[in-house]
């Protein structure tokens, strides 16, 4: 039961980050490496604010805003300064490494015995007895569902449709008299806001911040997105965002099983990268066959 709960907790936390990467990778077709910096940005801010006694719920809003600002800067570097998309993300990711260190004051910042989303008077009063072990899962589930439904709602608005259009065909958006650059910046801001929010929740769940915790975030998020969309492509009754959330949980379940079978945790990043490459290659082969047919 402990293993299942752990998989669900971390799977749903990463699902929020995967929703952000779904925007950049699937909708905008933008290889945004900023997420490797915005995830620990949320964790660093969260840890510092928690230590200062800030309400844990408020940390969610602050970290989302901080991540959105980082994403906006990436967009500005790309759109206004005409830097290539991949390089824009790399520049911002590199800058955020130092920013995160400055915010936290050191490379590792524990927040044990602090009031967090998962350890406060309200949680202790509501989740009593046998229900206490499910408190983390329920709290994370609520936050994940709220973010999923908010993203679904946004994508159904005019701004959301324009975001999709920019990813599909920039020329059409330009012909409508809409600034495609601003639309890209908005998409990158939302995506990195979600990634930062995910880092905030992760830090409070793990009770610490580490400057290297964002390493490989992009690959994990992409793997979650591709696994979810590939596995559930025939489930037409599900929204894509639901598939992404499920994909993140499946990914974490695979990681947990690998560790359970004796795989060293130090090898997981390599295995993730190899699996991700295989998924990408298979996906490209499938698309080529469809075009030939």
Question: Where are the regions a protein language model picked out?
Answer:
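Short loop segments and helix-boundary regions at transmembrane helix junctions
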Residues: 26-31, 72-116, 122, 207-211, ...
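Transmembrane alpha-helical segments in multi-pass inner-membrane proteins
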Residues: 192-270
């Amino acid at each position: 039961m402990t293993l299942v709960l752990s998989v669900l907790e971390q799977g749903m936390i990463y699902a929020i980050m995967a929703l952000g990467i779904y925007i950049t990778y699937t909708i905008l077709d933008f290889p945004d490496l900023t997420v490797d910096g915005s995830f620990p940005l949320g964790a660093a801010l969260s840890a510092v604010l928690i230590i200062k006694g800030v309400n844990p719920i408020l940390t969610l809003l602050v970290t989302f805003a901080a991540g959105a600002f980082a994403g906006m800067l990436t967009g500005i570097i790309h759109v206004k300064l005409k830097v290539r998309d991949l390089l824009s993300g790399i520049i911002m990711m590199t800058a955020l490494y130092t920013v995160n260190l400055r915010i936290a004051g050191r490379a590792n910042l524990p927040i044990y015995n602090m009031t967090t989303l998962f350890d406060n008077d309200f949680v202790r009063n509501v989740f009593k007895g046998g229900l206490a072990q499910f408190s983390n899962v329920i709290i994370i589930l609520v936050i994940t569902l709220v973010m999923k439904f908010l993203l679904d709602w946004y994508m159904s608005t005019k701004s959301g449709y324009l975001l999709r259009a920019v990813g599909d065909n920039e020329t059409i958006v330009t012909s409508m008299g809409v600034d495609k650059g601003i639309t890209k910046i908005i998409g990158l801001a939302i995506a990195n806001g979600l990634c930062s929010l995910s880092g905030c929740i992760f830090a409070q769940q793990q009770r610490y911040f580490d400057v290297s915790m964002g390493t490989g975030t992009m690959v994990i998020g992409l793997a979650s997105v591709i696994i979810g969309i590939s596995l559930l492509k025939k489930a037409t009754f599900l929204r894509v965002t639901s598939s992404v959330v499920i994909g993140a949980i499946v990914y974490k379940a695979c990681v947990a099983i690998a560790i359970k079978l004796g795989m060293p945790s130090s090898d997981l990043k390599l295995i993730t990268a190899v699996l991700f490459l295989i998924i990408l290659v298979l996906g490209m082969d499938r698309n080529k066959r469809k075009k030939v047919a």
